[in-house]
Amino acid sequence: MPSAEQTSWVILAGGQASRMGGNDKGLVELTGKAMIEHVIGTLSPQTSSITINANRNQERYSQYGSVFGDNIQDYPGPLGGIHAAIHHLDDEWIGFVPCDCPQLPHDLVERMANACSEDTDIAVAHDGEHIQPVVTLLHRRILPKLEAFLANGDRKIILLYRQCNMITVDFSDQPNAFVNLNTPEELQQFGQTL
């Protein structure tokens, strides 16, 4: 089982943001701050190791921390960022969160790390109704499975997880913590509730 201090965390901001009108979701403003600032604000008290995976606007993202892009072209989705992170970071355990999830749990890192055992490959957050496949903590030993999966042209993240020793981590006490803001309308509605 890793301790929270033995994990590195990556904010996934590498997508095309097609539902956000092509605007980079991590840089879209929510209550006067870039959305990624909300994510960093929640994660930074929990871990000292935060990096950003971005394929566009890397210079802008670099004002928030260390940035790296995908190794695979054509936007393979979150799996591209996961693949790049395993190559970019040396840590055994790497956690991932999306850049468009501004209310992450304040105990995310600790709960995810505590749920893992020696044989866990992937821990995935569960909000009580659904798994949150991009809120995950994984062991780097999944890399061969991930590379074979991507080489086959597969992109559906949950299908990869099913090939691994996956556990779910219960966050049913905080179901609203995983609200993703994918469209300008969702962003506006969410901003009005804060």
From Swiss-Prot:
UniProt EC number: 2.7.7.77
Originating species: Photobacterium profundum (strain SS9)
Listed cofactors: Mg(2+)
Annotated gene: mobA
Protein name (Swiss-Prot/TrEMBL): Molybdenum cofactor guanylyltransferase
GO cellular component: cytoplasm
Pfam families reported for this sequence: NTP_transf_3 (PF12804)
Similarity comment text for this entry: Belongs to the MobA family.
A GO biological process held by the record: bis(molybdopterin guanine dinucleotide)molybdenum biosynthetic process
Entries under HAMAP family matching the protein: MobA
Function of the protein: Transfers a GMP moiety from GTP to Mo-molybdopterin (Mo-MPT) cofactor (Moco or molybdenum cofactor) to form Mo-molybdopterin guanine dinucleotide (Mo-MGD) cofactor.
Heme among keywords: no
